[in-house]
Regions:
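Substrate-binding/active-site groove segments that recognize
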Residues: 55-78, 94-98, 137
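Cell-wall polysaccharide-cleaving catalytic domain and substrate-binding groove, primarily
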Residues: 42-67, 123, 160
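Catalytic-center loop of serine/cysteine hydrolases
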Residues: 110
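A short secondary-structure junction motif
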Residues: 47, 67-75, 127-130, 134, ...
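Second-shell loop/turn segments in exported
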Residues: 9-13, 23-27, 49-58, 77-89, ...
Length: 169
């Protein structure tokens, strides 16, 4: 008889590694940490390339129209449609590009990833609202200033999951 715990572990292992090739390629192209990308995918879709969010987000990294169109334009892709984001490769490329853009805006801080994740989750306007006084450069103060519990949890869960994936390359 198969041990149920072993079966559960095996299924989780397979799911955790189902998009590795795409993640590594996107990380290389955009010079990002593959463990971070993988952690975002885990949080956003649990590795389901067909995931659909309530606000129109699609795919592994739950990309919305505006971000997808910005990425397509920057990549020189013409005739891009939001539904193309069901394609795992396009989705991870777009999401990684967008996350890199968000993180790069916060290089003056002690932890640009925290600010970038907040922007990825809650939008730039909210990050700018929370980004005052100490919170402008201190990530611990910034997290305290975040008004949405879901965004705080989002950042914390991704940072923890990133550590789990730290040896992933």
């Amino acid at each position: 008889m198969i041990d149920l715990a072993a079966l559960w572990w095996w299924k989780e292992y397979q799911l955790d590694h189902s998009q590795d090739e795409i993640i590594i390629a996107a990380a290389s192209i955009y010079e990002m940490d593959p463990a971070l990308i993988k952690a975002v995918i885990w949080r956003e879709s649990r590795f389901n390339p067909n995931a659909r969010g309530v606000a129109g987000e699609l795919g592994l990294m739950q990309i919305r129209d505006v971000a997808a169109n910005e990425w397509a334009k920057s990549a020189g892709i013409t005739n891009f449609h939001h539904e193309n984001l069901i394609n795992a490769k396009s989705n991870v490329l777009a999401g990684t590009w967008y996350l890199k853009k968000a993180i790069s805006r916060h290089q003056h801080t002690d932890d640009p990833v925290v600010y970038g994740l907040a922007e990825y989750n809650a939008g730039r306007s909210n990050v700018l609202k929370w980004n005052s006084e100490d919170a402008a450069t201190n990530s611990a103060s910034f997290i305290e200033a975040i008004e949405f519990p879901t965004t705080k949890n989002y950042i914390i869960s991704i940072k923890k999951r990133r550590e789990k994936y730290r040896d992933f390359k």
